Amino acid sequence: MSRRGTAEEKTAKSDPIYRNRLVNMLVNRILKHGKKSLAYQIIYRAVKKIQQKTETNPLSVLRQAIRGVTPDIAVKSRRVGGSTHQVPVEIGSTQGKALAIRWLLGASRKRPGRNMAFKLSSELVDAAKGSGDAIRKKEETHRMAEANRAFAHFR
């Protein structure tokens, strides 16, 4: 048994302008090579573009997009008796949000377009409307979990 205590769960910090934890999570995921100021620039430009496109509160669009992409259930590989099964597992809210952000950023990176701010804003608006690559990824994950429902007892 381990002698060390369990690590306390850190509270997510919020960003300086919008005072929003989701924005900060997005910044930390978009970050590359330690260039945080560039990550903030990209996010804030994307938020401005969302404001121009939808003429609504961009943070509510962001929340709606993340809520729409967040998966409830996923599959995990589990080895049972020499064969590997995809076992459906429920996902917690924090892990679900992290997955949603990862999928949104992945989908926006794959998009054709001028710059990352433009691509991210387009993907967020699409996800808020219920379309886009990230939403398709969520639906695909749910389909996989539904197809492998028979292995749920391996949990």
Swiss-Prot record:
It comes from the Eukaryota. GO terms for cellular component: chloroplast; small ribosomal subunit. Pfam families: Ribosomal_S7. Keywords: Chloroplast, Plastid, Ribonucleoprotein, Ribosomal protein, RNA-binding, rRNA-binding. It is found in: Plastid, Chloroplast. Transmembrane segments: none annotated. The keyword Chloroplast applies. GO terms for molecular function: rRNA binding; structural constituent of ribosome. The keyword tRNA processing does not apply. InterPro entries: Ribosomal_uS7, Ribosomal_uS7_bac/org-type, Ribosomal_uS7_CS, Ribosomal_uS7_dom, Ribosomal_uS7_dom_sf. One of its GO terms (biological process) is translation. Gene3D superfamilies: Ribosomal protein S7 domain. Belongs to the universal ribosomal protein uS7 family. PANTHER family: RIBOSOMAL PROTEIN S7. Part of the 30S ribosomal subunit. HAMAP family: Ribosomal_uS7_B. One of the primary rRNA binding proteins, it binds directly to 16S rRNA where it nucleates assembly of the head domain of the 30S subunit. This is Small ribosomal subunit protein uS7cz/uS7cy. It comes from Ceratophyllum demersum (Rigid hornwort).
